[in-house]
Amino acid sequence: MAGAEYRFEKHLIVQQAEAERAMLNTFHQGEYTLEHPLVCHNLYLINPLSAVVAFRTEEAVAVTVTVFGKAKQGTISHTFPRAKEHILPVLGLYSGYKNQVEIREYRGRSVRLEIETPDVFDGKNPVYSMDTTPEYLQDQCIFLSPSANEVFAAFDYAGDARWCLTTPCVFDLKRLKNGNVLIGTNRLIRMPYYMSGLYEISLCGKIYREYRLPGGSHHDAIEQKDGNILCLTQDLTTETVEDMCVLIDRETGEILKSWDYKTFLQPGLGKSGSWSERDWFHNNAVWYDENTDS
């Protein structure tokens, strides 16, 4: 097209793989210890409130990572199993802050690190009000998901951001049985918010899998008991949207089964206030009832 400017951008999975490979090469070529670990802030490029710490110990030992809160109640810690080679995620860093992080061996030595993070929100406070208590929320966070170009973020009891994604992944986030999360991709295939499919990512932001769907994804997806995934979609070659669901093979990404709601529901019955012929159903959520297999 005359006058158009084209730019090639590597897929985020490729960018992350290159960054991880460079980190591992540095780690394996160096002598990193508990006292002098390798610290990689935002290793996977999309979560500036995370880091990865890598070091070796002479004996296999469990290690606890603690991110100290601005107040005692904001402290977050996690203990990792015994190993000699430790490549550990650091989650729960504050935005625009010199975070104090402790790495401690089980019944052994410890080191305190300072990890400085950028101001993800450019001086703005994204939370107007947080009505909870540290006794109730403890070290958990409340995750807020966008449907456009806002930041996907999680906030602690005090309303402080402790996790975010700076790439515009959208809609619901679901915790998977393996500890990763399922989230819509950042790759828009049609306005206003139909994405290429789903990512399985770690909370550090590492993408393990992308599930691409011909009709894209929107709003919601859930993991089944067998690990396969139910995801909301549509057929973009037709005149309607948000009126289909598919079952995705967790390992291969193959579509095992699809449901087109127009085959068993009559469009136009029970219209909502925002009803249109194109978006007649506007499916916002999906769930599975094991008792009725429906």
Predicted regions and their residues:
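Extended, solvent-exposed segments with strong compositional bias
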Residues: 68-69, 79
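Histidine-/acidic-rich catalytic cores in large beta-rich domains
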Residues: 3-18, 25, 31-67, 86-87, ...
